UniProtKB/Swiss-Prot annotation:
Keyword field: Cytoplasm, Phosphoprotein, Repeat, TPR repeat
Cell location: Cytoplasm
One cellular component (GO) term of this entry: cytoplasm
Gene3D superfamilies, per the entry: 3.10.50.40, Tetratricopeptide repeat domain
Record's function text: May play a positive role in AHR-mediated (aromatic hydrocarbon receptor) signaling, possibly by influencing its receptivity for ligand and/or its nuclear targeting. Cellular negative regulator of the hepatitis B virus (HBV) X protein.
Assembly and interaction partners: Interacts with RET in the pituitary gland; this interaction prevents the formation of the AIP-survivin complex.
Source lineage: Eukaryota, Metazoa, Chordata, Craniata, Vertebrata
Designated name of the protein: AH receptor-interacting protein
Pfam families xref list: PPIase_AIP
TPR repeats: 179-212, 231-264, 265-298
Superkingdom field: Eukaryota
Bilayer-crossing regions: none
Record SUPFAM superfamilies: FKBP-like, TPR-like
Entry-annotated residues carrying Phosphoserine: S43
Amino acid sequence: MADIIARLREDGIQKRVIQEGRGELPDFQDGTKATFHYRTLHSDNEGTVLDDSRVRGKPMELIIGKKFKLPVWETIVCTMREGEIAQFLCDIKHVVLYPLVAKSLGNIAVGKDPLEGQRHCCGVAQMHEHSSLGHADLDALQQNPQPLVFHMEMLKVESPGTYQQDPWAMTDEEKAKAVPLIHQEGNRLYREGHVKEAAAKYYDAIACLKNLQMKEQPGSPEWIQLDQQITPLLLNYCQCKLVAEEYYEVLDHCSSILNKYDDNVKAYFKRGKAHAAVWNAQEAQADFAKVLELDPALAPVVSRELRALEARIRQKDEEDKARFRGIFSH
């Protein structure tokens, strides 16, 4: 440990161990995932806190070798063992980009692409970005750089291949290989009744494919092939949303599928159920009629749905009549 601390000091980083970690120091080969809580503080006597992952409610996940925009974090993380708590005072040369990187940390902490919301900014918005970061403390730090203190608590270190990466952190090849596995995991979770978790898996698989699809010419064979992989995942996602009673999201997604594939029976059926749930009786009946037209074998299932819809409508009519009688009797 003494030689590690000495090497850090030579590079302008002062490490102070607050709590020793467990076991041996991991080798931190490329692809290793480090999960840790961090707190960023000013290096002055007041030690004002700039950021705190615990406030965000989720620890940071850093994958070694992915060229994170704040290289010093890879440097210091690779000196820590699981369970270790340490503080690192870093010279200005290591943290001059911190104000810019800080804007991405919120996205990373929740498993999103760190550039989300930045790629499609118009020119005026980008010019504003360069002049202001939207946070007074970060603006001040950008204009007047100073050393920073990082308080780190290493929670977990996972070797390559022992964990599932967030979609934004994968290469294109990794995304393509991961989709069937994520799909299977979503199916397993749904069968076991973990609907919310299953929806999250389907969402991740869709995100992988959408990212790959963005790199293809719309309408090209490659684009269509990816879209045909997205469709069953999106239908599974819609099934989760039906169970969760998030009907308007189901309506949106099923309509988007039917705009491209107007013979998709499952999309008509799920949209019909969603319409029925929000009292769009005519739309529900039209969708169920389309299901029968495309697949007459589903007649028993459709009849059951239509009977349930009619029963709900009758019950609602009776409740409305009773309510109106109560109003006019006063």
